[in-house]
Curated annotation (Swiss-Prot):
This is Imidazole glycerol phosphate synthase subunit HisH 2. Its main location: cytoplasm. Residues 3-212 form the Glutamine amidotransferase type-1 domain. One of its GO terms (biological process) is L-histidine biosynthetic process. Keywords: Amino-acid biosynthesis, Cytoplasm, Glutamine amidotransferase, Histidine biosynthesis, Hydrolase, Lyase. Heterodimer of HisH and HisF. GO terms for cellular component: cytoplasm. It is found in: Cytoplasm. InterPro entries: Class_I_gatase-like (IPR029062), GATASE (IPR017926), Imidazole-glycPsynth_HisH (IPR010139). Disulfide bonds: none annotated. The gene is hisH2.
Length: 212
């Protein structure tokens, strides 16, 4: 059984993620700091809201350094969800009105950019179910059928990766949308696995059994 630290930085909704972890038969511990992370086998970084606000909360609580110790030094598997995935990037242009991009955690060589679908009839945010195309194999997708790769999205920004090898899956919404990224012991999903019914639970279960 995995012991999962779910990071709560004050503006993210952790309840549905906790329920999904427990549904998969694992122990979930909601943590605001180093307590919980040090004893965890896996870490989940959920996220809703604005990039800049989230990063301020994370830095104010010292969670950026705590994550670096747990993920980069101790090698614990990290799953970052929705805004959480975007926070892995180097920068984001969200609400960067003065031209200065917000700085992220920098765990993935990527920048976050506003969705600009070519079809003007497509509304922003991208909200609802969408299929993803698997670009390469990864343990979080093991034994998942191509017909079971539909997930629930809610977002207005998306990650643009410098290294295409970091991209595991893409969706299409008037443009290519990075849906899953992975590097070493880090994985991020732009969609919400905890809200994606059977496909999301299967992916979550794969993550919780992953020991990179």
């Amino acid at each position: 059984m995995a012991r999962v630290a779910i990071i709560d930085y004050g503006i993210n909704n952790v309840r549905s993620v906790r329920n999904a972890v427990e549904y998969c038969g694992h122990e979930a511990v909601v943590t605001h700091g180093n307590d919980g992370i040090a004893d965890a086998s896996h870490i989940i970084l959920p996220g809703v809201g604005a990039f800049g606000d989230a990063m301020k909360k994370i830095r104010d609580r010292g969670l950026d350094e705590i994550l670096a110790r747990g993920v980069c030094e101790a090698g614990k598997p990290l799953l970052a969800v929705c805004l959480g995935m975007q926070l892995l990037a180097k920068t984001s242009e969200e609400h960067a009105d003065d031209g200065e991009f917000f700085q992220g955690l920098g765990l993935i060589e990527a920048d976050v950019r506003r969705l600009r679908p070519k079809d003007p009839d497509l509304k922003i945010p991208h909200m609802g179910w969408n299929n993803i195309t698997k670009l390469r194999e990864h343990p979080i997708l093991v034994n998942m059928r191509e017909t079971n790769l539909a997930f629930y999205f809610v977002h207005s920004f998306a990650m643009s990766c410098e290294n295409e090898d970091d991209v595991v899956g893409r969706a299409t919404y008037g443009q290519d949308v990075t849906a899953i990224v992975a590097r070493d012991n880090i994985v991020g999903t732009q969609f919400h696995p905890e809200k994606s019914q059977d496909s999301g639970i299967e992916l979550m279960s794969n993550f919780l059994q992953w020991n990179p």
